[in-house]
């Protein structure tokens, strides 16, 4: 087969296939050109989903009349002049491919004038061939019309979606561009009807309200952080506006709209602790980073980027979003009485019982205590030898299950000791001290404070307490393990084994002792003590799946969170009757948790109802 040299017309149409996928691609390229030209107002008009007309008008710098024809030549650009420039790009466009690609598959007319010229210049191109160039009267800025897109490439036109879907895609990209550039006024008209209007503002929340409406605006949480590497800011939605898809997620790098799995994973992992599973959060995130640390020259449409410091970027985003949500939850549970309670904590009575005075046969049913002293409370079993079927093998506990043993033989602590320990650890209560009223349906604890009723999900609350305890133990490398009498042998798929092998140290620090058994098979010999009697194989595979979904770039801290989340299944269950003291202790532990308001899986742990809420329900007030 002989090698042929393609004609300029053919090569331009092939190149157009990379840049001009659909009508929304044309809108994106033209609007980005307007933004690069310093426009303050951009008007877009489309007809029939952009098939028959795409019109973009701006009030930017305009194109010099002597450069009008050059603008439609391949690789002609005003934004870079040498190869090194692509590594420090500050503009949205730079390759000089958009206009020639668009003009090669449509009928295009462009008018433009700069402030230095009294008259503008107009050029018309059909299918890549120049029809005419002439002087014209026009305002400062650029006015471009693209008609009959793909008229000369029927194969491409055939694969366009319905008019409504193409119009929706255009609306979506204009929304993203408006979010990225709230300092610019945007207007989109579809078949003569105005569908998007934003006004120039220095307040992003105003643009969010204009695009998404009041409900979205009222349910977003702001976050912001500045580091030497990157500045991060934006908004993330609460559970009220989470969706079943990622359509309402927007990522901007130096104001360029992109899609990036690393950033998406960082935000979603940060939100995961506060939101129900099977939902995706609404978020708008901006990253400002030095151009030399990010490569946008990865994809023809510049929709993907690569970072030099992926792990650092992930951690900064994760921490920033997580802290923003946590602070918002704290604000919603702000209590005036906390200061008074803090003062009471330091009024320690002399008759506080010491650790040595507590009898080990004191019992608390159904609930694992959080650390009551600097030394972790341990179940009194011999870790030097295996545990037959996880049961204590002594005669005294012969007829008792491990779960009963774990739940009933934990050291009892007094409220005075709890206060002393909180002083030692310098932990602050996140909600007021509550008076326990009782238990509803053996699942929810009812408690009150002042004129407020608190409803606590006992399982979700205990999960969060265990989660934070386990995570802290991992951080301090203080996880206690229990030996399995019969190691659990797990045969992994090759892909799963790769993820295990990559994270061996993570498993080790989390309290798992695992040995290689040959041929992608491992033997799990020890598991974290607090798990009780877990289904070892199922838990291990669940953790592997979580790590796979996270990818390989995430930090160990995030991986430990994932393991802790999967491991917290030993929490007290729903429909389990608790004593009054157990309920008090659970609430007290939850008060001093770092993030007490959501379980590790995102469900709320506590709901607050005020007297006003009840009076509205009973129609006492409107």
UniProtKB/Swiss-Prot annotation:
The keyword Cell membrane does not apply. One of its GO terms (molecular function) is ATP-dependent DNA damage sensor activity. The keyword Iron-sulfur does not apply. SUPFAM superfamilies: ATPase domain of HSP90 chaperone/DNA topoisomerase II/histidine kinase, DNA mismatch repair protein MutL, Ribosomal protein S5 domain 2-like. Belongs to the DNA mismatch repair MutL/HexB family. Disulfide bonds: none annotated. This protein is involved in the repair of mismatches in DNA. It is required for dam-dependent methyl-directed DNA mismatch repair. May act as a 'molecular matchmaker', a protein that promotes the formation of a stable complex between two or more DNA-binding proteins in an ATP-dependent manner without itself being part of a final effector complex. InterPro entries: DNA_mismatch_repair_CS, DNA_mismatch_repair_MutL, DNA_mismatch_S5_2-like, HATPase_C_sf, MutL/Mlh/PMS, MutL/Mlh/Pms-like, MutL_C, MutL_C_dimsub. This is DNA mismatch repair protein MutL. NCBIfam families: mutl. One of its GO terms (cellular component) is mismatch repair complex. Keywords: DNA damage, DNA repair. PANTHER family: DNA MISMATCH REPAIR PROTEIN MLH, PMS, MUTL, DNA MISMATCH REPAIR PROTEIN MLH1. It comes from Clostridium acetobutylicum (strain ATCC 824 / DSM 792 / JCM 1419 / IAM 19013 / LMG 5710 / NBRC 13948 / NRRL B-527 / VKM B-1787 / 2291 / W). HAMAP family: DNA_mis_repair. GO terms for biological process: mismatch repair. It comes from the Bacteria.
